[in-house]
Amino acid sequence: MNTYLFYDLETTGLNKAFDQILQFAAIRTDIRFNEIERHEFYVKLRPDIIPSPQASVTHRISIAKSMQQGICEFEAVQKIHKLINQPNTISIGYNNLKFDDEFLRFCFYRNLLAPYTHQYKNSCRRMDLLPIVTMFFLYKNDVFKWANSDGKICAIMYVMKRIEIKDHV
């Protein structure tokens, strides 16, 4: 049975080779979007990492929180690898093909795990919501409410959180 794994990463910066994951969150659903399981954990900051100030302002995860509540990167990456490589998983994110997925591949490689198996092995696949959301905005604009409280057009993930997916399936 196929399952969807909606996931997101918070990182110390944008450089997939030199930054690291600080937080991982995922929700696995069946094909009808019924929640099966939920995962969220912090990752301890490695000693060789200096977080980007911009990233810290964006995600608001302090170094103290990371160190107190986080697990080591090796353990975190093993958990992520197991989740994302579960047979018949379709991993889904928002801009994940250009950012999160590349970040994960570097983390998997750095921690001695197969970096590409979540893309093909065990009937696993991946999908990015960003191009789909863009197509809706351009060609079927009336389906979603696109403006934030200020009336400005906003297509980031927190807007999508307001949408009840089941109403549009």
What are these regions (language model features)?
Residues 90-99, 103, 107, 144-169:
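Acidic, Mg2+-coordinating catalytic module of metal-dependent nucleases/exonucleases
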Residues 123-150:
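Short alpha-helix plus adjacent loop in nuclease-associated cores
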Residues 106-122:
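A short alpha->loop->secondary-structure connector
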Residues 1-109:
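Conserved non-catalytic scaffold segment of RNase H-like nuclease domains
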Residues 43-45, 129, 165:
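Active-site donor-binding loop signature of nucleotide-sugar glycosyltransferases
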Residues 35-38, 119-125:
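A short coil-to-beta-strand element that immediately follows conserved catalytic motifs
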